[in-house]
Every structure is written in C-alpha cells, then in structure tokens.
Amino acid sequence: MNASYQVVVGRSENLLGPYVDKDGKDMLKNNWELVLEGDGQKWIGPGHNSIIIQDDEGTDWMIYHSYLKKDGGVGGRLGMLDRVLWTDDGWPYIRNCIPSNSELIPVFYN
C-alpha cells in the first residue's frame, strides 16, 4: 500500500480564507504545515483526524487513524491517539510528525 495521507494545518483570519502556512504562503499553492505523516516503517497514511481535545490536566490530544504496515502489506486501520504540542507562536504539532508507539495517556477525572 502506498498511502501518502498526511495531516497538515493552516490558518486564516477569515473563515472563508485564504488559509496560509507558518510562513504566510497560500495553502492552495501546496504550502502547509505538516502535523503528522507515516514513518515508512510501521505506520502508513495517518489522517482523518478529529478536533483537538484537552484533558483535565490541560494536555491536548488528537484522535486519528493510521494503517499498520505488516508483512509487506497492510495489517489494518487502527484508531490512534497522540499528544499535541504547540510552538511558541501557536502552531500545533505531533512529536517527530509521526505516530507514536507509546505515549502518555489523557487524564480525565470524571
């Protein structure tokens, strides 16, 4: 399976756009900020993410899916959860831009 699915992010001051990357370049001209992509080894085509949720300790999380690479093929599509981090100027990112194999878990008290 050759899946080039990725999660990217852009911003706009207007709901109708234009949406731009971190450098202010138009996303419609293939400019965007990468949040998540496959690692080429274990995870293929991560994407279809949900909204970012915040747990009771103030940590942000993103739910998405990714295909598991197995025996030269695809072992199935799995639900995934990763911690979202933020740059100093407010752009979201996932550590190393790839799905994690292990990570902290969200904390919910109720």
What is each model feature region?
Residues M1-N110:
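Carbohydrate-active catalytic/glycan-binding domains of CAZyme proteins
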